[in-house]
């Protein structure tokens, strides 16, 4: 039996419909949101002010009216005292999704501020949003005028607003300049000059914006130079790199910028002209984590699985396997679990190099890294097919405990019969996304570190002892060679004063870091 409409007139239904509309708008399902909106109106429900303005904007924009007509239709709502900054910020994002011009969005913000009179001071969040929109539209002078009129130092902030600084709006302007044409140099000079004239101190948001801009321009050397300036400034001012900084700098070492960072004659790492190496950047990240006022080994706003994956990708792209090993062990150091992405990065770069090594023409008797990783004689290479079966074989190296693998000491104590369950790892189907990982299944880092040890050993340049002595290298075992390479990377990447790691999350890795 269908209930009468009046039986649905209750607060719970009103709240439910509003939440449905908000969810649909967040997912950018505009037509579905309008359908629910019409349902609300038919049932004599009136949406809240902020939501009503968004729906009004959608309905008017869908009718192909001019921007002038849309602006007039929104005037009353923007001027209403109950309309909030939060609502305006959401409206500006919505108008961007509807492909409304930046000039129009800037004028909407202008009308909102003007309607509140001279006693009103917009928050830093709103000012940053508006100057960013104006900068994207090429209205740099107008944006700077906003900053003169609405000094971010005295702007109002709601208690729920994120903590911002005086330079944040300037950083927003620079970040908004997606166009990398040379004429933007003049605009950026104006922005920085404006900061100097008004004594606005630089903070990490400004440096991040400038570093990101150089990356978009394809100038990794300039990005690294800015990073070096930031490190020097951090010695005398309360400004330090954050997780965004390190994420951007690690991307300098991605394959896209390989021509800037690598030799065309080798797969090995080549330092940039400013001598900032990938291992040094990683060391900086660990150092700044450890220098926090209240350091915590297992909780960090900098050291996260995401940033470790970004760093891992950089090391793998340069075939710096000892460095990649240190990154993997950092997961254990901070009691973090690897993600499916971690496994994907390792397997992708290893298999790409295997495919490259096995596919090239070779001289008689020539042995390559890919051959040694797989344990192949050079005569057998021609019969190998690089496919999912081969990838499963490489992944299975993670089940082997060898090459000085300290994680396996006391392993027989895990079961009464002396056996031990394998460490948890995904299959290639999971890694490739062909099969979903079971919900809640944790992944272990140990299989990846075992695979990485084998990748290190496969490097023909791995040497110890006196290079001038014929027996200088032969006297050392493979395990010692691998351990030496890892220790060398660790010394370069982990500061000495950093706390030693605790056991891994599953408490099965008993020994020290290396």
Swiss-Prot record:
InterPro entries: PPR-containing_protein, TPR-like_helical_dom_sf. Signal peptide: none annotated. It comes from the Eukaryota. Residues 405-440 are annotated as: Disordered. Part of the gene cluster that mediates the biosynthesis of clavilactone A, a meroterpenoid that features a unique benzo-fused ten-membered carbocyclic ring unit with an alpha,beta-epoxy-gamma-lactone moiety, forming an intriguing 10/5/3 tricyclic nested skeleton. ClaR, ClaS and ClaT are sufficient to produce clavilactone A and the function of claZ, if any, has still to be identified. The biosynthesis begins with the prenyltransferase claS that transfers geranyl pyrophosphate (GPP) to hydroquinone to produces geranylhydroquinon. PANTHER family: MEMBRANE-ASSOCIATED SALT-INDUCIBLE PROTEIN-LIKE, PENTACOTRIPEPTIDE-REPEAT REGION OF PRORP DOMAIN-CONTAINING PROTEIN. This is Clavilactone A biosynthesis cluster protein Z. It comes from Ampulloclitocybe clavipes (Club foot). The gene is claZ.
């Amino acid at each position: 039996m269908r209930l009468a409409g009046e039986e649905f007139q209750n607060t719970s239904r009103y709240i439910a419909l509003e939440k449905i509309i908000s969810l649909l708008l967040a997912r950018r399902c505009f037509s579905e949101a309008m359908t629910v909106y019409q349902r609300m109106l038919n049932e004599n429900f009136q949406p809240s002010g902020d939501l009503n303005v968004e729906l009004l904007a959608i309905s008017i924009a869908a009718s192909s009216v001019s921007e002038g007509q849309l602006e007039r239709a929104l005037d009353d709502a923007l001027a209403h005292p109950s309309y909030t900054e939060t609502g305006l910020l959401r409206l500006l994002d919505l108008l961007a999704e509807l492909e409304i011009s930046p000039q129009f969005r800037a004028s909407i913000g202008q009308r909102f501020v003007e309607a509140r009179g001279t006693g009103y001071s917009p928050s830093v969040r709103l000012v940053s949003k508006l100057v960013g929109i104006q900068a994207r539209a090429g209205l740099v002078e107008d944006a700077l005028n906003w900053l003169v009129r609405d000094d971010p130092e005295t702007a109002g902030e709601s208690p729920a607003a994120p903590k911002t600084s005086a330079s944040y709006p300037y950083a927003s302007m620079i970040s908004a300049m997606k166009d990398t044409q040379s004429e933007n140099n003049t605009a950026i000079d104006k922005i920085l000059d404006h900061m100097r004239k008004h004594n606005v101190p630089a903070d990490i948001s400004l440096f991040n914006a400038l570093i990101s801009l150089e990356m978009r321009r394809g100038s990794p050397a300039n990005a690294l130079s800015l990073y070096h300036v930031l490190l020097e400034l951090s010695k005398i001012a309360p400004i330090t790199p954050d997780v965004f900084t390190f994420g951007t700098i690690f991307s300098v070492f991605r394959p896209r910028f390989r021509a800037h960072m690598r030799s065309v004659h080798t797969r090995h790492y080549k330092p940039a002209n400013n001598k900032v190496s990938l291992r040094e950047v990683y060391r900086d990240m660990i150092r700044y984590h450890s220098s926090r006022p209240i350091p915590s080994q297992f909780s960090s706003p900098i050291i996260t699985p995401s940033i470790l994956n970004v760093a891992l990708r950089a090391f793998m792209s340069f075939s710096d396997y000892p460095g990649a090993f240190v990154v993997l062990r950092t997961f254990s150091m901070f009691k973090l679990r690897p993600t499916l992405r971690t496994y994907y990065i390792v397997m992708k770069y290893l298999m790409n190099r295997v495919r490259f090594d096995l596919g090239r023409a070779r001289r008689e008797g020539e042995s390559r890294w890919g051959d040694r990783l797989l344990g192949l004689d050079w005569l057998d290479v021609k019969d190998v097919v690089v496919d999912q079966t081969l990838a499963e074989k490489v992944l299975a190296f993670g089940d082997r405990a060898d090459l000085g693998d300290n994680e396996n000491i006391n392993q027989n104590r895990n079961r009464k019969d002396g056996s031990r369950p394998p460490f948890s790892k995904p299959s290639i189907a999971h890694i490739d996304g062909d099969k979903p990982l079971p919900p809640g299944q944790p992944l272990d880092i140990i299989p990846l570190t075992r695979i990485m040890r084998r990748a290190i050993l496969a490097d023909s340049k791995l040497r110890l002892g006196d290079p001038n002595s014929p027996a200088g290298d032969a006297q050392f075992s493979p395990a010692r060679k691998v351990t030496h390479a890892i220790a060398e990377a660790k010394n370069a990447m982990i500061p000495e004063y950093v706390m030693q790691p605790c056991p891994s999350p599953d408490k099965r890795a008993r020994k020290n870091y290396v």
